């Protein structure tokens, strides 16, 4: 049977990490947002009415990484050493990659995942008017594949 460290007697609780040593940690998370070709072109050309989409998404992701413990209840507040946010355009999508680094008592994967999620949501928010069809729906727009692609500890 799987043991969950965040549950004790059926109650949610924050795990006690106070006795753990500080260790260098890094996490890399990625995810994609699928968009219409015209929307991708507008982002590339810098012609989106709301402004620079990727610059805004980069700032939003960084802020989200720093605020992760405020929105995920059992996530510890950790000293972040670095956050990098990059975007790659593929065939019909933009991929966000967030790298988080810390020297602390617990991992930084939740921060990286939160950063990717908010980056992609910010992109959606900035281009939603271009993505809607005549019925106000989003037939192409899709966020998927949010995952941790790498986690390092002690290097």
UniProtKB/Swiss-Prot annotation:
GO BP field: Mo-molybdopterin cofactor biosynthetic process
GO terms, molecular function: cyclic pyranopterin monophosphate synthase activity
One matching Pfam family: MoaC
Matching InterPro entries: Mo_CF_biosynth-C_arc (IPR023047), MoaC (IPR023045), MoaC_sf (IPR036522), Mopterin_CF_biosynth-C_dom (IPR002820)
Signal peptide range: none
EC number, UniProt record: 4.6.1.17
Keywords recorded for this protein, A-Z: Lyase, Molybdenum cofactor biosynthesis
Reactions performed catalytically: (8S)-3',8-cyclo-7,8-dihydroguanosine 5'-triphosphate = cyclic pyranopterin phosphate + diphosphate
Transmembrane segments: none
Binding residues for substrate: 74-76, 110-111
Annotated catalytic residues: 125
Pathway: Cofactor biosynthesis; molybdopterin biosynthesis
Assigned protein family: Belongs to the MoaC family.
Function: Catalyzes the conversion of (8S)-3',8-cyclo-7,8-dihydroguanosine 5'-triphosphate to cyclic pyranopterin monophosphate (cPMP).
HAMAP family, A to Z: MoaC_A
Subunit field text: Homohexamer; trimer of dimers.
Name under which the protein is recorded: Probable cyclic pyranopterin monophosphate synthase
Organism per entry: Methanoregula boonei (strain DSM 21154 / JCM 14090 / 6A8)
Origin organism lineage: Archaea, Methanobacteriati, Methanobacteriota, Stenosarchaea group, Methanomicrobia
């Amino acid at each position: 049977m799987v043991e969950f460290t965040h549950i004790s007697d059926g109650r949610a609780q924050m795990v006690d990490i106070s006795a753990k040593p500080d260790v260098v940690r890094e996490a890399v998370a990625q995810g994609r947002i699928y968009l219409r070709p015209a929307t991708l072109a507008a982002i590339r050309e810098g012609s989106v009415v709301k402004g620079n989409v990727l610059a805004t998404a980069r700032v939003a992701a960084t802020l989200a990484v720093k605020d992760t413990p405020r929105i995920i209840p059992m996530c510890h507040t950790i000293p972040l050493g670095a956050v990098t946010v990059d975007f790659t355009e593929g065939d019909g999508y933009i991929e966000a990659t967030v790298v988080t680094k810390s020297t602390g008592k617990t991992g930084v994967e939740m921060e990286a995942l939160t950063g990717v999620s908010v980056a992609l949501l910010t992109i959606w928010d900035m281009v939603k008017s271009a993505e809607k069809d005549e019925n106000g729906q989003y037939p192409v727009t899709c966020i998927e594949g949010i995952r941790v692609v790498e986690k390092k500890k002690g290097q």
